[in-house]
Amino acid sequence: MTIMRKTHPLLKIVNHSFIDLPTPSNISSWWNFGSLLGICLMVQIITGLFLAMHYTSDTSTAFSSVTHICRDVNYGWLIRYIHANGASMFFICLFIHVGRGIYYGSYVLNETWNIGIILLLTTMATAFVGYVLPWGQMSFWGATVITNLLSAIPYIGTTLVEWIWGGFSVDKATLTRFFAFHFILPFIITALVLVHLLFLHETGSNNPSGLNSNSDKIPFHPYYTIKDLLGVLLLLMVLMILVLFFPDVLGDPDNYTPANPLNAPAHXXXXXXXLFAYXILRSIPXKLGXVXXLLLSILILXXXPXLNTSXXXGMTXRPXTQIIYWIFIANLLVLTWIGGQPVEXPFTTIGQIASILYFTIIIILMPIASMIENDILKLHT
């Protein structure tokens, strides 16, 4: 008799994805972040659902409904802080996941990579509309500043912004629709995740050596299930330390003041997750150029397969590109720091230099380094 998991129509899918999946025998802990992102998504959907049971998306009651959740609902404070800090953990895992993809050349799996970029953009959109919901000062002004960027689009900009707002400013209609978007987007993300996995399992996973691993595969279960479980436990431990000891360390104190359209906070800072893109946005004086650069900062990832000039797949055995890669990571951290600083010298200058460096590394330095390495390889063969 054959095993049920291999014959049952539903269990067969699970079996081919998580149990009998042939996996490279040498993938490192950097490959754990895919499963961690799945856990983050599940945690966010569950906590979000419970928050939505008590939240009201009306300008007059939104702020007090969040207060009510924290004060009166059983473990409401816990659910809220898991949701808020879970989002930060989600983005940390996302950036590590993308960084690993760039380092080990996973972008050669085109469909998987492109869906990953769409996932990144969708997650950023979800985080943005979610940040508006508590209706604090930062929520309101963040929404105003970011939606206003669309007014830079020639001819239709202003009309487009007013259409998104549902009026002439961020108001009741905006909050209600943002809540609707925030509710639906995670399910769209879940669907995209399944497509992401579908395309990944067509080709199989990449591995640290960058070589074809078809001759050396092991079953996903028990080897990687137990490895992923360790990752999940570590993730949940870090998340719970954040939630229970430092719940507000990644938040903004301004968001504890109810939204007031009449006075703006000293400086509106975007959510911690998208700060590097925000700094690139602020580095360009013209509004349209800034919006274009903001989009490009993420969309440039789509060009990574095309910009790949190397003969070898990953960066494991490419020291010159490795150095440039780590400069790139340091530069990203600088951009993230600048994004949280006020718009004054020397921060603006540092931001502009870091922004130029961001694009220069991806478009010029990395391909050149790869070509030089190819030439060195030819010399030694």
From Swiss-Prot:
What positions does the entry give for a ubiquinone binding? Answer: 201
Q: Name one GO molecular function term.
A: ubiquinol-cytochrome-c reductase activity
The UniProt entry's GO CC annotations, sorted and at most eight, read: mitochondrial inner membrane; respiratory chain complex III
User: What membrane topology was assigned to this protein in its record?
Assistant: Multi-pass membrane protein
Q: Which residues bind heme b b562?
A: 83, 182
What does the sequence similarity comment in the record state about its family?
Belongs to the cytochrome b family.
Please give the name of this protein. Answer: Cytochrome b
